[in-house]
């Protein structure tokens, strides 16, 4: 269970490194008017909504650990694209939507892994997962802010996010190799 918490705390830090600085990224780098930020946040939120469904669908169709690794891998690439193309308004909007999708799609498969690993402690596992997401929030926001303190632009937190998501990907791969019983495809089953 601690290994899964580490995957979440590090891998989801990539989301928060990007999302914590989305407003200055959009206004300072992409050059959107501040009045457009609520609409951009709705776009990201709509992507997150779709991501929840995508993650659940993927967890049903393949092994949850594999789904998590694939999604973290794609998230790494997309965060690098955010870093590279944030000066283009249309690319920035499209990547915000895709980041929204990817950021939430990993949640379902990784939660399934945790619940399966918990064995009769599912409620406690769910609480630990929430704590891991909170750790990811603080780690991502903190590490994403370091380049800003050093004088780099607002696209750099996305690069930090890519490294964190890559850490989540590596941990998923190691998890799949080390804990094979928890990485098998899930048949629909009652959890609680």
Segments the model singles out, each with a brief description of its role:
Residues 1-42, 46:
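Extracytoplasmic gate region of multi-pass secondary transporters
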Residues 24, 107-117:
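Intracellular helix-loop hinge segments at the cytoplasmic ends of transmembrane helices
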Residues 34-42, 123-127, 158:
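Small-residue hotspots at the loop-to-helix junctions and early N-terminal turns
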Residues 45-53, 137-138:
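Residue-level signature of mid-helix packing/kink "hotspots" within the transmembrane helices
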Residues 51-64, 148-149:
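Helix-to-loop junctions at the C-terminal end of transmembrane segments
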Residues 65-110:
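C-terminal transmembrane helical hairpin of 12-TM major facilitator-type secondary transporters
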Residues 116-154, 161:
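A late C-terminal transmembrane helix in Major Facilitator Superfamily
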Residues 162-192:
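Multi-pass alpha-helical transporter architecture, strongest
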């Amino acid at each position: 269970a601690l290994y899964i918490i580490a995957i979440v705390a590090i891998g989801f830090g990539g989301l928060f490194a990007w999302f914590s600085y989305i407003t200055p990224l959009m206004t300072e780098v992409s050059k959107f008017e501040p009045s457009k930020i609520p609409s951009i946040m709705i776009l990201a939120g709509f992507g997150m909504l779709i991501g929840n469904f995508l993650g659940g669908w993927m967890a049903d169709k393949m092994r949850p650990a594999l789904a998590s690794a694939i999604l973290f891998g794609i998230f790494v690439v997309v965060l690098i694209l955010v870093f590279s193309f944030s000066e283009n308004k249309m690319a920035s909007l499209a990547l915000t939507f895709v980041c929204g999708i990817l950021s939430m799609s990993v949640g379902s498969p990784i939660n399934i892994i945790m619940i399966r690993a918990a064995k009769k402690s599912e409620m406690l596992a769910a609480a630990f997962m929430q704590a891991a997401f909170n750790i990811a929030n603080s780690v991502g926001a903190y590490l994403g802010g370091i380049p800003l303190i050093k004088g780099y632009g607002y696209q750099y937190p996305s690069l930090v996010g890519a490294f964190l998501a890559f850490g989540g990907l590596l941990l998923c791969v190691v998890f799949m190799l080390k804990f094979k019983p928890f990485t098998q495809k899930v048949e629909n089953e009652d959890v609680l």
